From Swiss-Prot:
Pfam families: PglZ (PF08665)
Effect of deleting the gene: No methylation of 5'-GGTAAG-3' in chromosomal DNA, BREX no longer confers phage resistance.
Keyword terms of this UniProt record: Antiviral defense
Induction remark: Transcribed at similar levels in lag and exponential phase, rises in stationary phase.
The protein's name in its UniProt record: Alkaline phosphatase-like protein BrxZ
Superkingdom of the organism of origin: Bacteria
Length: 865
């Protein structure tokens, strides 16, 4: 033993005791006594010393002094020990290798000396120090061996999961990088006699047994046990030989698998092992005919995720009218909280796409007979309240599906085709036919107005000006987003309403005809009259001033104490620069162009829905800047027009051919023609722009009925200009900044609350279920809550796997919002008299949310063969 360890051992004893007894029957250290120097310690060689005199000196003469009493023999029996009373309040020092090692480690159990001696080769300086960081005073042979294994494996703790994580990581590195660390670890375990200890530990804790135990075989049994517990219960027989043996072992193994998937540090290792096991086991072959609902908990391999998705796609295609919506939505939510969706965004997007597809199918089922409304006002109201959701669901489905396709996956191809046919061939066709019937019956081309619906051409007078009747309103901001469709604005409004200091309210207005940029932008400006000038093509003039371009619009607005600016220019300004710029103006018009700039170009129109997502983000940021940095309190987000978009390429049937080529054309577009003395056509709406937009001249228009186009130049799938509701139902999203007191009173969307469904929680199996209730449905006032759920003992040790659950049900029936959580206990050492707690932890912040007392009363399951 090195001298410093010897000295350190003595110093450690004197740090806690005044008197230390040192028995050295082999007299190994008799020659070193003379050189032994310990500060403030008196050494007494008891070979010839009078024990009575020493006792007097220690207790009476020098009661504060520290003494080291060295004996050349073993401690005498108590009845012959003159110093017994002193010995009982003192400490003993042992100077053999094992004793000094125990002393260095800070372990007082001298009964471990023989075990330390057997493991003597383990105790290099480096390993001893690493072991010292792990041990406690309460060690036995088993716990000490486990911590030695942890040191050799390179684990930071002696938890079984940490040891396994390190060994598995070394195994994966060996397989993928030809790394030799695992070989070194295994050789070291064998050299120190710890290899059989490792396998016995795994047998005791997980029920793992094998004739020739190995990491490969352990992994096989872990994955098979995981599959057997989570997958279709009717398809377990094929896994039976490789399932771990005991109930407590299986529960511990399942808890390990849950922890493995949850710990992103070991993601690469899990993905590699899962792929290897998937190739070896081919679980998809066994579960191909299983119901996806029987696989709802399973996340063992990626092929299981793919099997579930295939089944859900088939269900949507084959059971679209009989689908159990609640079960379907619940399964989607559950799957999105599982491993493969959390680690591979394209799988999360697949379930988002399925959710929107189901939403679209449900809307179709509710309107299977078409869209028959008695008049235009009723039709308009129906669109604003519900029918716009067809367009929204279609857009969102394609947004997610395109993300999936971009990764090279074709899993949604058949559903893609089905949704496209539903939307384009049924919804748009039915909607346009029924809407056209109402427009024709009411002769709306000659009277372009709908009872109770504001008109876009009156926007400034009816929306902007009245704001100043409130003396507290000093400035109004108007954000005009080119081609912002009503359904996109609705999504924007929902997002804004999640902000505590803002409130958004969506209304609609009837857009001008033809519904295109120049005319729509002009209609939104303050004006008395709009007109075209024959010498300037399709440029619209407001009271004799051109409305084309930001500088001209700024000129018009200056007459009304207003100004115009592009959104990009405004966002580039520093806060004070922005405030200085708008200081002298009451009305600020901000032009934003993302959707139209993308959709109205042939080379980029396929990115229209991507542009909608970008626009929502940009507009929300713009609103936030106006309120927080420019101190805006009244903001209106509106548009010049909406748009029609179909994902599929158009055919010749989508094109209208005019019988006579119009002369005197001012503007020729895919969805409209503006000119003078235009010919009538059976397939077109014909009218005067004076009737539909308040233009003062005699210009006319032709618009294809329904969704057809005149030509496909400049892109054909993205269009506007016509009479379809998607084109002329223009959003007016009013956003208010709330004062502090109002903001505090404003009902804020907050996470749903979760409570235990039963007052007493009792677990009687190593793998058992707990029912939890989501108190409110997700909706306007409540948002989803994601929890980590697990069990701890009274020392706050985690004794189960951590389950990640998303509570996001929007069902209004309480019983439908109950979720069962399967918990896997770690080990079998549970006592019904001990205290345990069910912990509900916020998954994002990892802070406690709720806790409930739990009784664990396991049946006797492991006592016999």
């Amino acid at each position: 033993m090195q001298n410093q360890d010897f000295i350190a051992g003595l110093k450690a004893k004197f740090a806690e005791h005044r008197i230390v007894f040192w028995h050295d029957p082999d007299k190994r250290f008799i020659e070193e006594l003379e050189q032994l120097k310990l500060e403030n310690v008196t050494l007494i060689n008891m070979t010839h010393a009078s024990q009575l005199a020493v006792k007097k000196r220690i207790e009476m003469d020098e009661p504060e002094q520290q003494f080291l009493l060295w004996f050349p023999h073993d401690a005498p029996p108590h009845e012959q020990d003159w110093l017994l009373d002193i010995r009982l309040y003192s400490s003993e020092f042992h100077a053999d290798f094992a004793a000094i090692t125990l002393n260095t480690l800070g372990i007082p159990q001298l009964g471990l000396r023989e075990h330390i001696q057997r493991r003597k080769a383990f105790f290099s300086t480096k390993r001893t120090q690493a072991l010292k960081n792990l041990v406690t005073e309460q060690e036995d042979e088993t716990s000490l061996d486990k911590k030695m294994i942890a040191v050799i494996a390179g684990a930071k703790t002696a938890k079984t999961e940490d040891i396994l994580f390190n060994l598995i990581t070394q195994y994966v590195n060996q397989q993928t990088e030809d790394d030799s660390e695992l070989e070194n670890t295994q050789a070291m375990l064998k050299r120190h006699g710890l290899d059989p200890v490792l396998w016995e530990m795994l047998n005791h804790e997980m029920g793992y047994q094998a004739e020739e135990p190995s990491l490969e075989n352990l992994l096989l049994k872990l994955f098979c046990t995981d599959l057997s517990a989570q997958a279709d219960r009717q398809q377990r027989a094929w896994l039976e030989k490789n399932v771990l043996l005991t109930p407590s072992g299986r529960a511990s193994a399942l808890a390990f698998m849950v922890t493995w998937r949850a710990d992103r540090r070991y993601k690469e290792a899990y993905d590699y092992c899962a792929q290897q096991m998937q190739a070896a086991l081919r679980p998809e072959d066994h579960y191909r005919l299983s119901s996806p609902y029987d696989l709802h908990e399973c996340e063992t391999t990626l092929s299981i995720e793919q099997t579930i998705i295939h089944a859900l796609v088939t269900q949507l295609l084959e059971e679209s009218t009989t689908l159990d919506r609640e079960a379907f939505k619940k399964l989607l939510s559950e799957r999105q909280s599982k491993y493969w969706c959390q680690t591979q965004p394209e799988y999360y997007a697949i379930y988002d796409a399925l959710r929107q597809a189901e939403r679209l199918l449900n809307l179709r089922n509710r309107h299977i007979d078409g869209f028959h409304y008695q008049d235009s006002a009723t039709f308009w109201k129906a669109y604003c309240e519900e029918l716009f959701r067809f367009d929204q669901a279609y857009r969102l489905f394609n947004e997610y599906a395109l993300l999936v396709h971009s990764k090279g996956a074709m899993i949604l191809k058949s559903l893609d085709d089905y949704i496209e046919a539903l939307y384009s061939n049924w919804y748009l066709a039915e909607l346009s036919r029924n809407w056209n019937e109402v427009l024709e019956a009411e002769n709306r081309m000659q009277a372009w107005q709908i009872p109770g619906v504001p008109r876009q051409k009156n926007f400034f007078n009816e929306v902007v000006k009245p704001q100043f009747q409130n003396p507290q309103i000093k400035r109004v901001f108007v954000i005009i987003s080119d081609a912002l469709r009503y359904e996109v604005a609705e999504e924007l409004g929902n997002q804004i309403n999640t902000e505590k200091r803002f409130t958004a309210e969506l209304r609609s207005q009837l857009g001008v005809l033809p519904s295109y940029t120049q005319l729509g932008m002009a209609a939104l400006l303050p004006h008395e009259q709009l007109c075209y000038q024959p010498s300037n093509g399709d440029i619209v003039y407001a009271d004799g001033l051109s409305t084309s371009g930001i500088p001209n619009r700024d000129t018009i607005l200056k007459n009304y104490k207003g100004m115009a600016i592009k959104s990009k220019d405004l966002l580039e300004l520093k806060n004070q620069e922005g405030r200085d710029l708008i200081r002298d103006y009451e009305v600020v018009y901000i032009w934003h162009n993302t959707i139209d700039a993308t959709g109205d170009t042939a080379s980029t129109e396929d990115k229209t829905f991507e542009a909608c997502r970008t626009a929502v983000t940009e507009l929300k940021d713009l609103v936030t800047k106006v309120i927080n940095r420019l101190h805006g309190t009244r903001i209106f987000v509106t548009a010049d027009h909406g748009f029609l978009f179909q994902q599929q390429a158009l055919s010749v049937q989508d094109k209208t051919t005019l019988q006579i080529k119009p002369e005197n054309t001012i503007k020729n577009h895919k969805r409209f023609i503006i000119g003078h003395q235009l010919p009538a056509d059976d397939f077109c709406w014909k009218g005067k722009v004076a009737d539909t937009a308040g233009v003062s001249d005699n210009s006319e228009f032709l618009i294809p009925k329904g969704i057809q186009r005149f030509h496909f130049s400049g892109g054909a799938r993205f269009v506007h200009g016509g009479t379809m509701l998607q084109e002329v139902c223009v959003p007016v999203l009013q956003i208010k900044a709330l004062q502090k007191t109002a903001a505090e009173k404003q009902p804020q969307r907050r996470p749903v609350d979760i409570v235990a469904y039963h007052p007493m929680i009792k677990l009687v199996n190593n793998i058992d279920k707990v029912s939890l209730l989501q108190t409110h449905p997700v909706g306007e006032l409540y948002e989803p809550r994601i929890l980590n759920i697990y069990i701890v003992d009274n020392a706050n040790n985690v004794v189960s796997g951590k389950e990640r659950i998303s509570f996001d049900s929007d069902n209004s029936t309480m019983e439908k919002r109950v979720r069962e959580v399967t918990l896997k206990l770690i080990g079998a050492n549970f006592n019904r008299r001990n205290e345990y707690w069910l912990i509900l932890e916020d998954a994002q912040t990892e802070t406690g949310y709720q806790k409930y007392p739990v009784i664990i009363d396991l049946a006797f399951q492991d006592d016999f063969f």
